[in-house]
Regions:
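Extended two-metal-dependent nuclease catalytic cores across DNA- and RNA-processing enzymes
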Residues: 1-143
C-alpha cells in the first residue's frame, strides 16, 4: 500500500497515531469519493481549499465513522466532551493547523512523485508547503 492511485498513502498515514493502514484502506476502498480526493493530491503545487476540506472530511471519517462534522477541530472537541476530558491526545485527530501542514507536505511530495518521469521537472521551493528554515537548516514547520 505504498501508493494508491499514485499517491503516497504511507506519508499521509504517519500523521494518524493509532490508526492503521488497513482501516484507512477499507474506508478508501468503500468510498469512490475518497479515492478521487487522493487522486487530486499532486495535480497542482498549491493545495486548494476544496481538496483540503475533503482531506479533513476523510480524517474525520478515520476517527469517527459517523462524525457528524467535516472539521477536525470540531471533531476533536466532540470526542473530548464525549469522554469527559479523560482522553489521551493521541486518541484525537490532529488539530486543523497540524493537519493543514501535513496536507501541504503530502501534496508537495505527491506533486514531485507525479512528475518523476519528466526529464527536468521544475520543482518550487518547499518553503510554504509545510516546511520552514530554522538556524539555516530545513525543518518541518511545527504548529
Amino acid at each position: 500500500m505504498q501508493s494508491i492511485a499514485g499517491i503516497p498513502c504511507i506519508y499521509w498515514l504517519c500523521a494518524f497515531q493509532g490508526r492503521g493502514k488497513v482501516l484507512v484502506f477499507r474506508i478508501m476502498a468503500k468510498d469512490q469519493g475518497f479515492q478521487e480526493v487522493f487522486q487530486g493530491l499532486g495535480r497542482k503545487w498549491q493545495l486548494s481549499n476544496e481538496l483540503y476540506r475533503d482531506l479533513q472530511r476523510f480524517t474525520c471519517t478515520i476517527y469517527c465513522k459517523n462524525a457528524g462534522t467535516n472539521e477536525v477541530n470540531e471533531l476533536r472537541y466532540r470526542l473530548f466532551c464525549l469522554k469527559k476530558g479523560d482522553v489521551d491526545s493521541n486518541q484525537l485527530p490532529p488539530c486543523n493547523d497540524s493537519l493543514r501542514k501535513h496536507a501541504l507536505r503530502a501534496n508537495y511530495h505527491t506533486t514531485i512523485w507525479k512528475r518523476s518521469l519528466q526529464l527536468c521537472p521544475v520543482i518550487p521551493s518547499p518553503f510554504g508547503c509545510g516546511w520552514c528554515t530554522e538556524d539555516g537548516r530545513d525543518r518541518k514547520s511545527v504548529v
